[in-house]
Amino acid sequence: MENLVFVSAQPDVQYFHWQVKVYVHNFIEKGINPNNIHVIFAIVNKEKKPTEESLKLKEMGINVHHYVDDRFQKHYIPNIKPFLISKWLKEFPKYGKCFFLHDADIIFRQLPNFENLLNDDI
């Protein structure tokens, strides 16, 4: 599990900041290395730079990435996630082999056996 990267992608808005704080605290509490946690934010609402609150998340020891939301069509909100993942993978292709993509509203009661999932042929 040491090579598994945990990734969430969402707009850089207050609603998601607190969700990220909660799940990061939970992940670290369950033994996930903060260095393996990547939070990807879209800079939205015609802003040009990340919010202070999203930048402060770096103090938790996690990786925080920001990309301007320059999608041509923004009316279908869920497509922000694949948009952000593609931007992130273009910048960091080494993470493309294996990552656990999750929403920001996640917590683990206990960790799944990721080794079994990683060794599955499916």
What positions do the PLM features span?
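N-terminal anchoring/stem segment of glycosyltransferases
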Residues: M1-I77, W88-Y95
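GT-A fold catalytic core of metal-dependent nucleotide-sugar glycosyltransferases
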Residues: N79-I122
